[in-house]
Amino acid sequence: MRYESLIFDIDGTLWDSRQLVAEGYNIQLAKEGLSHLAVNAELFRPLFGKVMTEIADVIFSSVPAPERYELMKRCMDEENRYMHNNECNIGYPGVRETLKKLSEKHRLFIVSNSQQGYPELCMEKLGISPYIQGHLCFGDTGTTKGQTIRTLMEKYNITDCAYIGDTQGDYEATLEAGVPFLWAAYGFGTPAGYDARIDQFSDLLNL
């Protein structure tokens, strides 16, 4: 692969956390007597990749703002605790082995639209921390994913890279950032365009 650096999305690219996220949210909702707002894994399929406020506007639309965003924050905190303690393997096949091999020739990074702590949680659970040289998320920057990609590039002096993601939002972020898009076709979305496609994570070794 010709790119000096590779930047990865998380959900739908490195792992599928939908079931654990839904379970974590529902634990918090039950604690607050809000089980009527319970969510399920499939609800998150079209939402992963969006920023937290956009997700809250959909799943907690019946809760007035700004209370819905405060509720979202509490659910995400519980989600992180729940996922940290859950030993279920939610990584896509071959992620750790592929990243280890890629790290021998490329610098590897993560950019996500997630809350703070989520990239670290992903790296810890998948055992990929030794291979990731840096990460940024919406919780860090408060900006669009495209701008967050640019911020990461500036921070780490990245001039030649590609972004690996799965959704239309990821594709649009690469257009904003001005970088190639490698589509993880096994993920959650169908983007309008891409520069290369992978049908399984290990396909990255063959590009």
Go through each PLM region and give its residues.
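Asp-based, Mg2+/Mn2+-dependent phosphohydrolase catalytic module
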Residues: 1-4, 116, 120-207
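N-terminal helical cap/lid subdomain that shapes the substrate entry/recognition surface
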Residues: 2-93
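Conserved phosphate-coupling serine/threonine residues in phosphotransfer and NTP-handling enzymes
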Residues: 13, 112-114
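Conserved SAM-binding loop
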Residues: 14, 91, 108, 163, ...
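Short beta->alpha linker loops
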Residues: 20, 90-94, 114-115, 140, ...
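Structured helix-beta-strand junction loops
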Residues: 50, 104-105, 159
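Short, acidic loop-to-helix structural element flanking the phosphoryl-transfer center
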Residues: 81-110, 146
